[in-house]
């Protein structure tokens, strides 16, 4: 069984907040993680096994949903247990009740570790909870598997993770072909069942075409007008569809650098299908050889690196990219939460080659934003200095450094 790296902050937040929400796409492992946390809390009770076991409800199951017909009474009956509500966006009325229950228990002296909410769609969960549970709820995002969660003894694991993506069932499939079939079925189920359950009335075929077009244009600057013309819809419709895919945590819009630099900057976001395995499934790429021969290979690699890094970045990190009208560019700018001494700006260039070289435009861009650190991540597995004060770091090393920063912040 894989140990998810966010389990430490999840248990920490349950010690501090009455309610914690795990957000992540379907099949990312939220339910498994919730049960692992519940088991750990039970074992770490006043004495081993003394804490009451958690109570789990899957709100997509009619029988479990029916138990919340009178949520106030239900929560009162189980006041001594951690209540886990899976797919909580299926019961939107419960948020207002949770607020009253939490406040009542606070007055009685209970302050933390009461509710664990799991949601596959930030659209509903964030909108419903931002006001009702303000100050009472902490959020944790669970991404599919990332490199720091793989067995350290398996040298081939990162390559398989890039090809298959991080959804547990896809990554752990018995073969590349079986993994591809799983991902293709995942896409179909999302389009034909899951999205309609959330309410939006969007033709499945239209959304599939858009998703596939985004995969073809992985890591490119968004051209909404071209997408709209290709699909025969308006620019506003493209924006609405993109909002949906982003809110479902399936697509990322990486915003451009927003501060003044004295240069004319590209102002549209770059767009990424967040899971590399879904990129490859949308394009029918089932093997490493097929991927390496496809034009998307560079964009796929860039998106995969970015998702792995952001999964480890400390809370409060702001991510963007930098590009001027004349081509000076940084693939990823991380504004890390720093001390009172000022900004911590990491400029990260992403290269697939194991012998990376840098353009003059990268150094110009780093000067433009006054980057405090200049980094290159490539397929090479060694750390070494490069000209111009640039450090080359393997992906795993940089992820571990970011992760250590997050753990230090949690311990503060």
Please provide the spans of the model-predicted regions.
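Pre-Walker A adenine-sensing motif
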Residues: 1-14
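Hydrophobic positions on the alpha1 helix immediately C-terminal to the Walker A/P-loop
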Residues: 33, 37
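Accessory nucleic acid-recognition modules appended to NTPase machines
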Residues: 176, 180-344
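P-loop (Walker A) phosphate-binding loop of NTP-binding proteins
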Residues: 25
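Conserved catalytic/switch belt of AAA+ P-loop NTPases
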Residues: 95-117, 131
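Conserved lysine of the Walker
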Residues: 30
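Interdomain motor-coupling "hinge/lid" segment immediately C-terminal to the ATP-binding subdomain
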Residues: 112-113, 120-122, 126-225, 249-250
């Amino acid at each position: 069984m894989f140990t998810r790296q966010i389990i430490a902050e999840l248990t920490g937040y349950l010690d501090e907040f009455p309610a914690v929400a795990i957000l992540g796409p379907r099949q990312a492992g939220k339910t498994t993680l919730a049960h692992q946390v519940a088991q750990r809390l039970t074992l770490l009770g006043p004495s081993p096994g003394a804490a009451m076991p958690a109570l789990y409800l899957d709100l997509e199951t009619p029988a479990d949903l029916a138990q919340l017909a009178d949520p106030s009474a239900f929560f009162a009956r189980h006041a001594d247990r951690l209540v886990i509500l899976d797919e909580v966006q299926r019961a939107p009325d419960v948020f207002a009740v949770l607020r009253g229950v939490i406040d009542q228990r606070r007055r009685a002296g209970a302050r933390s570790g009461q509710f664990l909410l799991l949601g596959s769609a930030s659209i509903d969960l964030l909108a419903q909870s931002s006001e009702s549970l303000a100050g009472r709820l902490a959020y944790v995002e669970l991404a599919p598997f990332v490199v720091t969660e793989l067995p350290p003894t398996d040298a081939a694991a990162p390559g398989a993770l890039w090809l298959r993506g991080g959804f547990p069932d896809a990554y752990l499939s018995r073969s590349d072909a079986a993994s591809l079939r799983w991902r293709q079925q995942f896409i179909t189920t999302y389009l034909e069942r899951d999205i309609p359950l959330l309410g939006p009335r969007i033709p499945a075929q239209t959304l599939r075409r858009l998703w596939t077009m985004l995969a073809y244009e992985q890591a490119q600057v968004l051209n909404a007008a071209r997408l709209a013309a290709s699909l025969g819809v308006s620019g506003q419709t493209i924006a609405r569809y993109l909002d949906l895919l982003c809110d479902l945590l399936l697509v990322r819009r990486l915003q451009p650098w927003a501060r003044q630099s004295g240069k004319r900057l590209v102002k549209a976001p770059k767009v990424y299908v967040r899971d590399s395995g879904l990129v490859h499934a949308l394009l029918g790429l089932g093997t490493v050889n097929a991927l390496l021969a496809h034009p998307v290979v560079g964009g796929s690699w860039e998106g995969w690196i970015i998702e792995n890094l952001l999964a480890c970045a400390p809370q409060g990190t702001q991510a963007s990219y930098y590009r001027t009208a004349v081509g000076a560019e940084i693939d990823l700018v991380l504004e890390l939460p720093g001390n009172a001494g000022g900004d911590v700006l990491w400029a990260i260039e992403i290269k697939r080659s194991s012998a990376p070289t840098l353009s003059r435009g990268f150094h110009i861009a780093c000067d433009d934003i006054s980057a405090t650190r200049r980094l290159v991540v490539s397929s090479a597995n060694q750390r070494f200095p490069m000209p111009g004060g640039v450090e080359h770091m393997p992906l795993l090393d940089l992820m571990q450094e970011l992760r250590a920063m997050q753990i230090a912040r949690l311990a503060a």
